[in-house]
């Protein structure tokens, strides 16, 4: 319903600002200047609302990170990696929800590390390096673990690398993989 969409959007914004732990009927109602009753009328439990926020967060990440169709890049894998890290840096609470919270098990995972459609990137990478799709998929998995590790460290404020440093890591990684 339109009302439940409003509550989901507000819960998503609370999550972006404060983390999923801050999502409760009282906080959603306070932001919308209403009582908690309409919030709870639309969701059987707060857990149901949080699950809806997770789904919304996953769709949001897909729009921000997945290699846009038609976008041309000389280094598609590098670009996606940098976009992934940029997403983690700009949306740390959404990143934590998706990958580090008790809800992370809901994140669709496949043999590429996460259930996102990176096939266009893999195909471009295979063509760029003149390797098979299978080899490109294997390279993607190795890169995913490196990029995801950097993103996790940045999100948890263990390190903060500049964009230039991150690009240099990617360039060196690429040089070492050939």
List the predicted regions and their residue ranges.
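Alpha-helical DNA-contacting segments of helix-turn-helix folds
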Residues: 15, 48-57, 98, 106, ...
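Helix-turn-helix
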Residues: 14-48, 52
């Amino acid at each position: 319903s339109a009302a439940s969409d409003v509550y989901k959007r507000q819960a998503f914004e609370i999550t972006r600002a404060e983390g999923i732990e801050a999502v409760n009927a009282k906080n959603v109602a306070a932001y919308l200047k209403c009582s908690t009753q309409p919030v709870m009328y639309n969701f059987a439990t707060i857990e149901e609302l949080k699950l809806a926020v997770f789904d919304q967060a996953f769709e949001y990440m897909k729009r921000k990170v997945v290699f846009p169709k038609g976008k041309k890049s000389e280094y598609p894998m590098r670009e996606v990696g940098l976009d992934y890290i940029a997403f983690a840096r700009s949306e740390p609470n959404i990143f934590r929800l998706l990958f580090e919270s008790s809800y992370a098990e809901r994140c669709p995972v496949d043999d590429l590390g996460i259930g996102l459609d990176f096939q266009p990137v893999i195909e471009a990478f295979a063509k760029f390096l003149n390797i098979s799709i299978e080899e490109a998929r294997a390279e993607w998995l190795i890169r995913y673990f490196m990029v995801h590790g950097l993103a996790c460290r940045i999100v948890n404020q263990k390190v903060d690398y500049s964009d230039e440093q991150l690009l240099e890591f990617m360039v060196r990684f690429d040089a070492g993989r050939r």
